Design a protein with these regions (language model features):
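Fe(II)/2-oxoglutarate oxygenase catalytic core
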Residues: 14-176, 184-209
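Single conserved hydrophobic/aromatic residue that forms the stacking wall/gate
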Residues: 1-13, 18
């Protein structure tokens, strides 16, 4: 029989509730960003070091050590700024992950944990346009699954494109996407043609036994 696609995407729960939750996350970010600018932090947020650190966190130091990919996006780690909001995201996430793991017997016996919750803002012209995978360096070999939740859809472009699956996932508000972290799911974020794209993303790591 045909196996289910290793890329799971869909809504978990009622659409109205999901949209409210997504709006809450975006609102928190916008408030945080406004405060940061007011505190004269804008230069630090957009510094070369901030971009280099962000690229390293996404791709691994050894894969793109120079940080010369011309990124145009900004991220914050929600778990360090708003624990209650992160807990709500994780609660939403868990239902989708349970469904995903139920489709693949090997994952049922694999101890997984997720702690990072990265909020990412991608403006017009932005995106991560280099094909990559999420377990591309020695330091990230424990990554087992990748997850991402699209927080809005009022922009053009910005699909997540998987090269070997020949699939583009169209962003829709509240959609959770889960996929394996290995090279079989090499992907990129397509150019945001207009508007601003917001997502939260992270990884499930295999716990040592």
């Amino acid at each position: 029989p045909t196996r289910p696609s290793p890329i799971l995407s869909g809504l978990v729960g009622s659409e109205m509730c999901i949209r409210d939750r997504c709006n809450d996350v975006i609102s928190f970010y916008n408030e945080w960003k406004e405060q940061a600018v007011q505190q004269h932090m804008e230069k630090d947020l957009r510094s070369r070091q901030a971009f280099d650190n962000y690229e390293a966190s996404m791709t691994g130091d050894s894969q793109f050590a120079t940080g010369e990919l011309g990124r145009k996006d900004l991220s914050i780690m929600l778990e360090t700024l708003n624990s209650p909001l992160t807990a709500r995201i994780n609660q939403y996430l868990q239902s989708g992950v349970n469904d995903y793991c139920s489709q693949y017997n090997a994952l049922k016996t694999t101890p997984l944990t997720s702690w990072a919750c990265k909020f990412q803002e991608t403006p017009e012209g932005g995106g991560y346009h280099v094909y990559h995978y999420e377990r591309g360096s020695w330091s990230e070999t424990a990554r087992e699954l990748v997850w991402m939740i699209y927080l809005n859809e009022d922009f053009e472009g910005g699909e997540t494109e998987f090269v070997y699956q020949k699939r583009r996932v169209q962003p829709t508000t509240g959609t959770l996407v889960i996929w394996p972290a290995g090279f079989t799911h090499t992907h990129k974020g397509n150019l945001v043609l207009s508007g601003t794209k917001y997502v939260v993303t992270g990884w499930y790591y295999q716990q040592p036994i």
